[in-house]
């Protein structure tokens, strides 16, 4: 990376500073590219008891240290009300309905690329920037969202619900880099976040056990655990604590005449409040041939007058899967070439055309794969 003086640009960019290494290096790179750069630290969660489970104070201090080091101003903004209304209430409603949501996707759409973008524009910014591992490309009069260059860190799955108009106002400096390069840049320039661990999990839960957190907001409704033959073999403490494909924490090991194969969650019967389980990592009911998705968001309009061959992910870090997508009266139906394991209602399916992230939606239902004949 050249150390020569950058050509000054007129564009003013406000970087979403999380207190992590990716946003830190993003701000530095933009400075080196000649942009007028400022930072903004978002607080999206307020604890009633004053306990900062999501390390907000530490993160703010790290963000401030980086901004001081590279010589830029740091703004702060509290989007906790917007987060509660537009992300957290939906998160609770999905769990109450027996689904397994992904709040990070809604947070990106409603907070980072809406509330933050609007706030930054109000402060006089021309553009915003984040430390996401994605890329953007302007083509044919619209802005496309592309996978990050580092396949191990690509975050396009989480940004699929952000519209092209918002992507067009956003920069992603580390999307062109691999993670080791980012840390090396941070270390070379003495940034406080150079060796800071990547954040994992959901911010508002932090280090707490997920079940303990959820109990604060949703009453647990215990019920039976049944096999696919209808035999009751245990009790669950609440359907919301379990997800399709789950193996750990079922409490049903060591049953007589059950064999040694581990038990897995195969489904949920919401009407009867029953958790359905089966044995074996390759249990047929763990695999699906197709899914139905709703609440579809496209980065840019997608033509689907006839079925279209695409690639898709039904979870983060999954390799792209070949499928055919068609629009039906019920929603968007994706039929896969190969069996898909543990397709989970409430999670997102995201569609790709090569490196271009087209968009995606929320999985409503999955169709079992017929291993006895044609799929």
Swiss-Prot record:
Pfam families (alphabetical): tRNA_Me_trans, tRNA_Me_trans_C, tRNA_Me_trans_M
Top-level taxon of origin: Bacteria
E.C. number: 2.8.1.13
GO MF annotation terms: ATP binding; tRNA binding; tRNA-uridine 2-sulfurtransferase activity
SUPFAM superfamilies: Adenine nucleotide alpha hydrolases-like
Coarse class of the protein's main subcellular location: cytoplasm
Keywords: ATP-binding, Cytoplasm, Disulfide bond, Nucleotide-binding, RNA-binding, Transferase, tRNA processing, tRNA-binding
Enzyme class name: transferase
GO biological process: tRNA wobble position uridine thiolation
Site (Interaction with tRNA) residue list: 132, 347
GO CC terms in record: cytoplasm
NCBIfam families: PRK00143.1, trmU
Entry protein name: tRNA-specific 2-thiouridylase MnmA
Organism for this UniProt entry: Pseudomonas aeruginosa (strain ATCC 15692 / DSM 22644 / CIP 104116 / JCM 14847 / LMG 12228 / 1C / PRS 101 / PAO1)
Phylogenetic lineage: Bacteria, Pseudomonadati, Pseudomonadota, Gammaproteobacteria, Pseudomonadales
Name of the gene: mnmA
């Amino acid at each position: 990376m050249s150390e020569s003086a950058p050509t000054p640009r007129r564009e003013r960019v406000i970087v979403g500073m999380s207190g992590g290494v990716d946003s830190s290096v993003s701000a530095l790179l933009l400075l080196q590219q000649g942009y007028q750069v400022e930072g903004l630290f978002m607080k999206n969660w307020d604890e009633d008891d004053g306990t900062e489970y999501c390390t907000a104070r530490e993160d703010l201090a790290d963000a401030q240290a980086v901004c001081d080091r590279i010589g830029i101003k740091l703004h702060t903004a509290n989007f906790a009300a917007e987060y509660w209304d537009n992300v957290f209430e939906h998160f609770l409603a999905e769990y109450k309905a027996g689904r397994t949501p992904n709040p990070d996707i809604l947070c990106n759409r409603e907070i980072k690329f809406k509330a933050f973008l609007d706030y930054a524009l109000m402060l006089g910014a021309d553009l915003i920037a984040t430390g996401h591992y994605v890329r953007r490309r302007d083509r044919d009069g619209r802005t496309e969202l592309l996978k990050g260059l580092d396949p191990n860190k690509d975050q396009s799955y989480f940004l699929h619900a952000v519209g092209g108009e918002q992507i067009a106002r956003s920069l992603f400096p580390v999307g062109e880099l691999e993670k080791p390069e980012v840390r090396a840049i941070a270390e070379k320039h003495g940034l406080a976040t150079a060796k800071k661990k990547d954040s994992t999990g959901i911010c508002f839960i932090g280090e707490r056990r997920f079940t303990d957190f959820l109990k604060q907001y949703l009453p647990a409704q215990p019920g039976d655990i049944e096999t696919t033959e209808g035999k009751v073999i245990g009790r669950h403490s609440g359907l919301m604590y379990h997800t399709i494909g789950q193996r750990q924490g079922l409490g049903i090991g060591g049953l007589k005449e059950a064999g040694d194969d581990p038990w897995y969650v195969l489904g949920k019967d919401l009407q009867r409040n029953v958790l359905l389980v089966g044995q074996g990592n390759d249990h047929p009911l763990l695999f699906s041939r197709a899914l139905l998705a709703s609440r579809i968001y496209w980065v840019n309009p997608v033509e689907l007058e006839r079925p279209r061959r695409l690639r898709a992910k039904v979870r983060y870090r999954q390799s792209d899967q070949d499928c055919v997508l068609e629009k039906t009266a019920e929603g968007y139906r994706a039929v896969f070439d190969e069996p898909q394991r543990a397709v989970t209602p409430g999670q997102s399916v995201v569609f790709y055309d090569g490196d271009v992230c087209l968009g995606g939606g929320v999985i409503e239902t999955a169709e079992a794969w017929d291993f006895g004949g044609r799929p």
